Amino acid sequence: MTKQNAFTREDLLRCSRGELFGPGNAQLPAPNMLMVDRITHISEEGGKFGKGELVAELDINPDLWFFACHFEGDPVMPGCLGLDAMWQLVGFFLGWQGLPGRGRALGSGEVKFFGQVLPSAKKVTYNIHIKRVLKGKLNMAIADGSVSVDGREIYTAEGLRVGVFTSTDNF
């Protein structure tokens, strides 16, 4: 059976409700924290490390919630939302791989911001390159990622770590 390799906004909303990978498994956050409109490509192969990759997009418009409050008179998408989107996508990759449990961001290595997303932008693109997937007592993915706006790279993150846990009671 061939795995689905692209996901629409409706697919991602289903994932936020726990309907895509099953109850108790990886979910994306619901809007407003869902920072992705579509996944245009997901694969277990390819990427910079040959272990998998994701490409996803967010459509930008001036009415997005964060522009009204960050910052008044100087609207810009918070950089932490781009970082969170990359964690969301690494967690999605684990669910797509069929690994059980709820996703939790576990950290990252170096993060760099060298650009910004303004209300005049059209599209943010996320590129995730899977470095390693651990399967066993701990199910976790490690990835590098980047965020581009209208084709220009503006953030990078190395060593993004996300795990999936069948119980988060002691987390």
From Swiss-Prot:
GO terms for biological process: unsaturated fatty acid biosynthetic process. Its EC number is 4.2.1.59, 5.3.3.14. Pathway: Lipid metabolism; fatty acid biosynthesis. One of its GO terms (cellular component) is cytoplasm. It catalyses: a (3R)-hydroxyacyl-[ACP] = a (2E)-enoyl-[ACP] + H2O; (3R)-hydroxydecanoyl-[ACP] = (2E)-decenoyl-[ACP] + H2O; (2E)-decenoyl-[ACP] = (3Z)-decenoyl-[ACP]. It comes from the Bacteria. Keywords: Cytoplasm, Fatty acid biosynthesis, Fatty acid metabolism, Isomerase, Lipid biosynthesis, Lipid metabolism, Lyase. Belongs to the thioester dehydratase family. FabA subfamily. NCBIfam families: fabA, PRK05174.1. Homodimer. This is 3-hydroxydecanoyl-[acyl-carrier-protein] dehydratase. The lineage of its organism: Bacteria, Pseudomonadati, Pseudomonadota, Gammaproteobacteria, Pseudomonadales. The gene is fabA.
